[in-house]
Amino acid sequence: MCIRDSNLTAHSYGTVRPPKNKQLSERLGYLYDEISLLLNKYKPNMLAVEDTFYSKNFKSAMSLGQARGAIILASYSANISCIEFSPKKIKKSVVGNGNASKEQVQYMVKNILQLESLPTPLDSSDALAIGLCYLNQNHME
C-alpha cells in the first residue's frame, strides 16, 4: 500500500499458494522464494503479518505457523522489519469490531481503499486489512 497526498492506494494484491503436491520443505521454500521476489519488487519499508492464533485444529495452526515462519524469514533476509498484529486487533482497526467476520473485513477493505470490487479471495482482503491495521496504528505516517 502507498500513501500519496493523503490518498491510500493498493498497488497490487493477491495470494501466494504453494503447490499442494510438493513436500513440506518445497512448499515452504516456494513461499519463501515468492515472498522474497515480492519484497524485492515492491521494496516495502515494513512487513506486517497476522500473529498466531489459537485453533481447535492443531494441524491447520501448525501449517499456518510454518508459513508465517517462511514469510518472516524472507523479511529478515531482505532486511525489512516485520511487525505482527492479532486477528482481533486487525478486525477492530479496520471494521471497528474485533469479532467481525471475514466478509465484513472484506467489505470495509474495499470501501477504505476505494476498490472497484471486493478483493478476492478472502486471504487477499485479510492481507490488505493487516496493512491497513499497520497504517492505522502508525497514524498513516
What role is predicted for each listed range?
Residues R4-E141:
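Phosphate- and other anionic-substrate recognition elements at nucleic-acid/protein interfaces
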Residues M1:
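Sequence context surrounding c-type heme c attachment/ligation sites in exported
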